Amino acid sequence: MRRPDFTQLLKVLDRQVPDRPVLFELFLHGPAHDYAVANGAKNLVDVYAALGYDYVSVVASDFGFPSMQGSHRGAAKTHSLNDSPVITDRASFDAYPWRDPAACDYSPLDGELPPGMKFMARGPCGVLENAIKLVGYDNLCLMLYDDPQLAADIFEQVGSRLAEYYRIAARHDSVGLLMSNDDWGFNRQTMLSPADMRKYVFPWHKEIVRIAHEAGKPAVLHSCGYFADILDDLFDMGFDGRHSYEDNILPVEESYELLMGGTLPGGKMAVLGGMDLHFLCTSTPEEINRRSRAMLERASERGGYALGSGNSVPDFCPVENYLAMISAINED
């Protein structure tokens, strides 16, 4: 087991070449988690350390936005974007029990870490995701036209509270990185128009980046979906790295050239993960290892890359496929 060294991930996020390959996932569950536990890991920190990560991904507190989603579906694994809205008009907005991030429990950030390891504090979903959870996707799209002031007020309440959540998390010495996780796109378009994204969503992400940088810590974006029409916005928000890539949108190899570019270190945004989930789950271990090694080789002189899945390793991914991916870091 290699020793954790968070400075290697910092080099990646600074778009430099790390001293050795770096691994990255939004979080670990399913086969990756189970494999580590079966081999002696006793807690979440052990899982990340045993598998070769330099950080532990955690939700920093019990803060969130209560909704009806999941309350009547038992163990359902999927849900509609229009499922169980709780804010439908001004009256339900005024009655909603908005939680105070400062009144929540941040004790997950007090956990003991091995030398060289830090926490990555991710959110309880993001600005757009929580607005959709509270209102419903179709309802939100209609609200932007029928009652734009109410829509603006909802985004204000969600965004300002998430910013405070990250501000509190960033104060902890154990936190080395803030992760703003917020899905923005379908396969061929953004979930809202780019103009509406710029008006309601992006300013809060820019504020989260500012909070991270003011605390001397990098900020990373996890956002699934199409992003070609908002590429300049991504750069303007100032994120140090981006996570989540799909082959049917833009393969990680092409994304790396787009975000890092050139032939030297110092591109615009580090690329994290990117092994497409369909590829990861359905290819042979040999094919996965070959593509993983090729991606590391592509970044070997320019840096700014950490190896991992395109999103997160799902329950149905064969464990040997996951191991074939991460084993690439140990090969010349």
Q: Can you name each region flagged by the protein language model?
A:
Residues 1-43, 76-79, 92-332:
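Active-site loop segments of alpha/beta catalytic cores
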Residues 41-62, 168-173:
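Catalytic domains of carbohydrate-active enzymes, especially glycoside hydrolases
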Residues 52-57, 82-93:
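N-terminal substrate-binding region of glycoside hydrolase catalytic domains
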Residues 70-72:
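An N-terminal assembly and electron-transfer interface module characteristic of large anaerobic redox
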